Amino acid sequence: MINNLTDYNIDLEEIHHIHKLDIPSGTAITLAEDVIENSNYDSWELAPSDDPKKLDINAKRQDNVCGTHKVNYNSINDQISLTHIAHNREGFGLGAVIAAEWIIGKKGVFTMNDILNLK
């Protein structure tokens, strides 16, 4: 729905613990790819980018943060944001168990979209 509103600029934010090695995270890259697929952006770049066709990913590393991902839609009138904040790592463990149970007896390469039957 919002992808048709061209008055909005989109950016992504992610925050993880200081020991996380990849920047941006795989989740941020997947979110960026989904936004790009459904918008006028051509690619993503670590913020700040001066290219209006590149989606900014603002990646931060801080102490005692499990994980935060945020998609912002900004216009001159308002900002709409969708945020996921992991308060602990239990959800990540549960996701790993669900994926392990799902993959029993299957061969190939899969993503969470397959496990969740999204595409």
Annotate each language-model stretch with its function.
Residues T6-K119:
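C-terminal substrate-binding/catalytic lobe of Rossmann-fold NAD(P)-dependent oxidoreductases
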